[in-house]
UniProtKB/Swiss-Prot annotation:
Lineage top rank: taxon: Bacteria
Protein name per the record: Large ribosomal subunit protein uL13
Gene3D superfamilies noted in UniProt: Ribosomal protein L13 (3.90.1180.10)
Its job: This protein is one of the early assembly proteins of the 50S ribosomal subunit, although it is not seen to bind rRNA by itself. It is important during the early stages of 50S assembly.
Gene source species: Agrobacterium fabrum (strain C58 / ATCC 33970) (Agrobacterium tumefaciens (strain C58))
Length: 154
């Protein structure tokens, strides 16, 4: 009896769609990151891109717990001396690219490296409810029903 090792040719990828409206960002990101890596499958192999293709819609309607909406800061550096920049979650969600909050939360839960970058290409995040992936016939994953803490109660 030897350890099962999946080969890239044996991978079966599914398409999953998740409605992020009212979901807590971190809890949504952990579920999506697990699906992207393929850790929810019995055939998980660490060095093979075994994850599913994930579509996240309504990313602009995600929820934060506590005061993170106004207090959480996202940092980046321009590359120039003294070029550290910051924005709050509120500024990003009300700005041009509100889906970036969800993308960054998921990206920071995926291992950094060539395989992680390939797995991140299987993620599509849209601010609104429209997406161009109807032809793939994605199955709906109801994250809100998995755990009551996944949804922010008002």
């Amino acid at each position: 009896m030897s350890t099962f090792v999946q080969k890239p040719a044996e991978v079966e990828k599914k398409w999953i769609i998740i409605d992020a409206e009212g979901l807590v960002v971190g809890r949504l990101a952990t579920i999506v990151a697990t699906r992207l890596r393929g850790k929810h499958k019995a055939t998980f192999t660490p060095h093979v891109d075994d994850g599913d293709n994930v579509i996240v819609i309504n990313a602009e309607k995600v929820a934060f717990t506590g005061k993170k909406y106004s207090d959480k800061k996202y940092y980046w550096h321009t590359g120039h001396p003294g070029g550290i920049k910051e924005r709050t979650a509120r500024q990003i969600i009300e700005g041009r690219f509100p889906e970036r909050v969800v993308e960054k939360a998921i990206e920071r839960m995926i291992p950094r490296g060539p395989l992680g970058r390939r797995q991140m290409k299987n993620l599509r995040v849209y601010a609104g409810s429209n997406h161009p992936h109807e032809a793939q016939q994605p199955t709906v994953l109801d994250v809100a029903a998995l755990n009551k803490k996944n949804v922010r109660s008002a």
